[in-house]
Amino acid sequence: MRLNNKVALITGAARGIGLGFAQAFAAEGAKVIIADIDIARATTSAAAIGPAAKAVKLDVTDLAQIDAVVKAVDEEFGGIDILVNNAAIFDMAPINGITEESYERVFDINLKGPMFMMKAVSNVMIARARGGKIINMASQAGRRGEALVTLYCASKAAIISATQSAALALVKHGINVNAIAPGVVDGEHWEVVDAHFAKWEGLKPGEKKAAVAKSVPIGRFATPDDIKGLAVFLASADSDYILAQTYNVDGGNWMS
């Protein structure tokens, strides 16, 4: 098993991509901490995985809570080997329609949270002197601007840049930092995304989702199962010589 006895802390892991990663990491032998603001759902998800998983409540916008959770995990499990910054929110508005409230919320969750998670966890990794792996979740939205997705695109572009800077700063401590940029991923959140598009583009419910799926060269949305294999690879020793990269998992939407 590629992650045997590793300790993995995953934010936003009660559902969706984060939960898929938690399940995959546990199957590879890791001890998994499902950190999510929705503690009830996180607890249910951890119980379904079994004794290899533990749920903790975490609001990534609360810096004191970040420090407390990281400290508690470090003390209970004897370190943290893997961090996945997955917690994020979506927002939709053109530049002339954004609000200060939306700006602060998107960047607090999508950028500030991951930045300070990296700070707290990397300091634990450095203190334990056994290296580690950090995986940040970017997006195809961070590769290019989209007229109606101003704040989300900007926050995910910033994650790609932050990944590169963190990677260069932490490599001397044996810590590899990389990112994954998924394309369109099916899940509960698409009901919200579809509703946003219906509002801004005057579409019927479900119309945008169908059009987006059709536009993907592979011809469908991704699922967490399409992404988890790359996450396991980046969390394992197989990726020891990979640094500061952002991997597209988008069905061919973005070619590099």
Curated annotation (Swiss-Prot):
It comes from Agrobacterium fabrum (strain C58 / ATCC 33970) (Agrobacterium tumefaciens (strain C58)). Belongs to the short-chain dehydrogenases/reductases (SDR) family. Keywords: Carbohydrate metabolism, NAD, Oxidoreductase. GO terms for biological process: galactitol metabolic process. This is Galactitol 2-dehydrogenase. It is an enzyme of class 1 (oxidoreductase). InterPro entries: NAD(P)-bd_dom_sf (IPR036291), SDR_fam (IPR002347). Pfam families: adh_short_C2. Induction: Up-regulated by growth on D-altritol or galactitol. Pathway: Carbohydrate metabolism.
